[in-house]
């Protein structure tokens, strides 16, 4: 589990100014935190963290010397400026189930010999205790053939009794369909007029 260093943010300084100075703003909230705790982290530290972790990942958040077991709840990415503006964290309590998402990662798609893969779902929503959190669900699609479908209920996360799925178990994660090359028929003289 990765650790991210942060510091309490003074609300006297605007977020825009902090971003210009190389910081990313955020909030830490949770049952044992009154209201929420405004924080700031260096852009460099956030960029490093997001190389391996994202929304739904569990991280250790160190704020002014105090360490929190936290879940990344939201990442506010500014596409126009090509930067992360804000990250929100939820402080975890070992006995409290939290709502999270797990990213779906398709493995071995280059080994599918016939057909085209259609990914219908990018993440799975669920509730679990901190000890049972999952940030990525890997799906091996190498054996898929035309007509094959993998649903949420087919994945390991759905079979874990400690996880309460919020995504429909019947939802299609990925399917393999035939390639249809449509060749336009030549126009006849009558149709051209």
Language-model segment annotations:
Residues 1-193:
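Acidic, negatively charged sequence tracts
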